[in-house]
Structures are given as structure tokens and as C-alpha cells.
């Protein structure tokens, strides 16, 4: 048999490392298409000249674009037969990615636990994205609910990894050369620096985007993400194509420009949950909350820990859960990340 039906829960072994196929050379074409698919306007990843003024050799690609490219490499081996992508932790961007870089990915299985229904289980993996020099550019943990091929297959001994609640500010990687000494607030689009944000502050990002069927499938193909639920309408009982969760992340992040234009680089992903599914026709809006602030090794660069929530139009902002503790039906995404901001 020459075709690949993908892995099922019983195919994973604790401690195994999976080298994912098909390296990807990044070009300016991907960046142009990213900016066409999402309302991306952050200056550092838009302008070579702005990036050079900030000490970088050129404009890096958007950090989430690098994430999607690495994530897409993992799908055929990790989540082709997934029921749902459940969460993220311990994500760190370690080096900027520039056009011309070639990315590949590898994942190590760090946890396995069969569900009580015996029909699926949860797989935890730590994924690394590597460039052409073999340098890690990105590392993160995610956990996925995966179907079993044979419900009678014996369950592995349950192993649930202990994961950090957040990435410590001292572990944030400031890209080599990055300096905001000559940062141009006018060109960046907003006057707000690190000191202008207060812990507990909440920001409604005002704008919204209605998701189109063709756009979300085009974006998911751009990342070479082959998960069946995003393309095949016969793969779900409701006959609908599920929007790739990363598509919602990028929509929310780019909408956050309105209020967080100077949050120029994402450097860590503390946690994340796809609270409810998103489908074509949904209009996505976003709000943020400042969870923490930290100084960095560079006196001109500060870090903001931000909570980014994506919600469907009509959902009340700044509220995520009902009285029973469950996410409200209109909440799509609840993401916790660190970003670099000029001081």
C-alpha cells in the first residue's frame, strides 16, 4: 500500500521523534499572500527599511507565518486524523525567519492518554522548527485529540506531561541586533509605548472580518496543512468545513493592530485554546487584556504579556465564560502570548 491514511492514536510511542516531510523555502510571495489573506500591518514585518532602522538585516516574516509553516509540516504525522487541536504551551520564537530561509520540522511525543470512551486519545508533542543551518527558530508544545483506528487496541500507560503555565520573561529571546532606539512611532502607526500600557487594561480592537470559505482554504493550503476537516465537507457530521484554528489566530492578531500597533514581535506563546469552532460566514472580532509587563536585557525593548480573545460578532467583549465556567458559544480563541514593544 503506497498511500498514507495518517497516524491514529495507537500508532504513537512515548519518546519517539518524528522528522516531518517536505522542507519549505520561504519567499516574499508567501509574505505578500499573508498580507492579502489577513489585515497584517505591523511595520517590522512589512518594511525592510523599518526593520533595518530597528537593527535587523531586513524585515522578518510575521512570527505567526513562521508558526503556520512549521505547524503545517506536522499535520500529516500528528493531526491528519485529529478530532480537535486542544491547546498550546511553552512556545518560544528563537530566531527571526527571513525570505530565503528553508524551514523543516520535527516533533517528539511527550505524552499519551486514551480517552474514557476508548475511541480516541490525546497526544502531546513538542515541535521544533529548524532552518537550513539546523538552528531552531521556533519550539512549542501542543496536544491533539486523535481517533483510534481500532477501539479494541490496548491503551498505553497514561502519561501527561507537566507544562509551565507561562514562559518566564527571563527566557524570552530578543533577536540579535534588535534595537528600538531609532523607532519611528509615526511610521509604526500609533504613539503608544511599553509604559503607556497598564496591567489589567483591556482593549477592544474595534474591527471585524467575515470569514469566507475560499479564503480560509487558500490560507490553509498555503501552509501545506492537509487536515481533512478543513477541506472535505463529508468529513464532519454537520457537513461543514472547520476553519483552521491558526487562521483565527492570525485574524485576531492582525486585528489587534488597532490598539497594539507597536507590539511588533511575538516572542512566546504561553497558552492557547480554540474555545469553539469557527465556520465560513462567521465574523471575527477581537479584544486584548494586558496580563503582565517585563523589562528585557535591552533597555529600549519591553515585553507585554497579552491575552488575545477572538469572538464571533454579537458576543459581548471582555467576557469569555458563563456562570458554569464554560466558554461562551461565541468565544473562538483564548490566547496568551508575549510581545516586544518599544520602551
From Swiss-Prot:
Binding-site residues, substrate:
60-63, 83-86, 94-96
> SUPFAM superfamilies, from UniProt?
Thioesterase/thiol ester dehydrase-isomerase (SSF54637)
Record-level Gene Ontology MF annotations? oxo-acid-lyase activity
Entry's induction text: Strongly up-regulated during growth on acetate as sole carbon source.
Task: Give the EC number(s) listed in the UniProt record.
Answer: 4.2.1.148
Provide the pH dependence.
Optimum pH is 7.5.
**What's a single GO BP term from this record?**
acetate catabolic process
> Pfam families annotated for this entry?
MC_hydratase (PF19315)
* Enzyme class name: lyase
**Highest taxon of the lineage:** Bacteria
What InterPro entries does the annotation carry? HotDog_dom_sf, MC_hydratase, MCH/BMMD, Thiol_ester_hydratase_Rv0216
The protein's matches in CDD domains, at most eight in alphabetical order, are given as: FkbR2
**Where does the record place the MaoC-like domain?**
47-116
Q: What happens when the gene is disrupted?
A: Cells lacking this gene are not able to grow on acetate as a sole carbon source.
Q: Name the chemical reaction catalysed here.
A: (2R,3S)-beta-methylmalyl-CoA = 2-methylfumaryl-CoA + H2O
Tell me which UniProt keywords the record has, alphabetically.
Lyase
Gene3D superfamilies xref list? Hotdog Thioesterase
Main function: Involved in the ethylmalonyl-CoA pathway for acetate assimilation. Catalyzes the reversible hydration of mesaconyl-CoA (2-methylfumaryl-CoA) to yield beta-methylmalyl-CoA ((2R,3S)-beta-methylmalyl-CoA).
The name of this protein is Mesaconyl-CoA hydratase
Starting at the broadest rank, the lineage of the source organism is:
Bacteria, Pseudomonadati, Pseudomonadota, Alphaproteobacteria, Rhodobacterales
Q: Name the gene.
A: mch
